[in-house]
C-alpha cells in the first residue's frame, strides 16, 4: 500500500468512527462546538489572512483571473462572514431525529420515518476557502463527519482554517475525525477519494466543469453533483425594461465569478432595437465584454458611437453559448419568441438558474413550467440561488441533479431517513 493510500484510509477510518458518535450527539453539544469554532476563527484572523496573502501572491504569479482571485481572497470582512455563518448554522433547527411521519397498521405496528445523517461526506472543491467553513458547519450540524479536499490554489489558507476548526472540534469534545482536511496537493489523492466506498458515504464536488465531470465519471462513491452555472436571463417582449436593466447588471456584475451569475442574455426581437444599445452601454461601465449574435451585433454597432463601448463588443461563436465565463463577459442573442428562448435554454442551459423578465402572466407561467432547472425566476436576479438567500443558512453547494437533492443544499439535504417500527410482539 502506497503512502497516499495509507494517508487517506487513515482519515477515512477516523471519519467513520466519528460519524457513529455524531449520529446521536446532542444538538446543544454541536451548537457549542460551532460557536467555539467561530470564536477561534475570529481570534486567529491575522493568521488566516497572512496565510491567504501567500496564496494570493502565488495566484497572481500563476496568472489566475480576477474572478478566481476574488474567490480566493480572504480579508477581515470575509473572516467575519465565516464567523457569522457558523453562528447562523448553530441557530438553525437541528434536522436530526425529526420524525417526518408516523402511522399505525391494522396489525397494531406503528411505523415512522426519522431523519438521520448521511454518515461521512467528502467535499472536493477549488479556490474558495470559505467552503472549508461552510461545509464544516453544515456537516457538523447535520451529524456528519467531513473530509475536505480543497484546491491547491488555496492550500495555505485552507490549512490555517482547517487546523483551527479541527482543534476547536476536539477541544469541544468531538472525536478527532469529525473534521479532516486533506493537506497534500497531490492530485492523485482525488482519484483515490473517488474509490473510498468503505469510508465515504457521499462525495460533493464544487468547482468548474473539469472537476465536476471527473468526479461524476470516475467515482464509485455516490455523488451529489453541483453543476456548472450557465445561467440565462430572457427579456420578454412585455418586459419592464428598467427592471430588466437592473436585474441584468446585478446578475452579471455583482460577483461574476460565481455559479449563479448571468452568462447569456436572450432578448425578444420586439424590444431588441431599443433595449440592446442601452444594456450594452450600461454593462460596459463595469468592464463587461459583450459577445453578440449576428443580429444583435448589427443593432448595437449601428446605434452606439462610443469607442470604449465598441471596443468591448464582438460577434459570438457557437462555443460561446455553451461557455460559463465566470468573468465580465456576456453572450447576447436576439430571439423571435418565447418558444425560441425556451429552446435555447433547453439546448445550452446547465439546469442551474434561469430567469424571465416579463409583465405577461401567461409567459411567466410557461417559463416556470417548461424550464428544467433547479431554480427558475420571474422578475428577479439569478444571484438569489444561494443557501443564505433562501433562508437555509450556509450551503454545501447548489445541486443541478434531480436525485436526493436539487438546488441550494442546506442541512436537510445532508440527511437521509430510516424507518422506525414499534410493535408489541407482532409476527408475520
From Swiss-Prot:
Gene Ontology cellular-component terms listed: cytoplasm
GO molecular function, one term: NADP binding
Catalysed reaction, written as an equation: L-glutamate 5-semialdehyde + phosphate + NADP(+) = L-glutamyl 5-phosphate + NADPH + H(+)
Domain of life: Bacteria
Keywords: Amino-acid biosynthesis, Cytoplasm, NADP, Oxidoreductase, Proline biosynthesis
Main location: cytoplasm
Subcellular location(s) of the protein: Cytoplasm
GO process annotations (BP): L-proline biosynthetic process
Acyltransferase in keyword set: no
Membership in a protein family: Belongs to the gamma-glutamyl phosphate reductase family.
PANTHER family referenced in this protein's UniProt entry, alphabetically: DELTA-1-PYRROLINE-5-CARBOXYLATE SYNTHASE (PTHR11063:SF8), GLUTAMATE SEMIALDEHYDE DEHYDROGENASE (PTHR11063)
Described purpose of this protein according to its UniProt entry: Catalyzes the NADPH-dependent reduction of L-glutamate 5-phosphate into L-glutamate 5-semialdehyde and phosphate. The product spontaneously undergoes cyclization to form 1-pyrroline-5-carboxylate.
Name of the protein: Gamma-glutamyl phosphate reductase
Organism (species): Clostridium tetani (strain Massachusetts / E88)
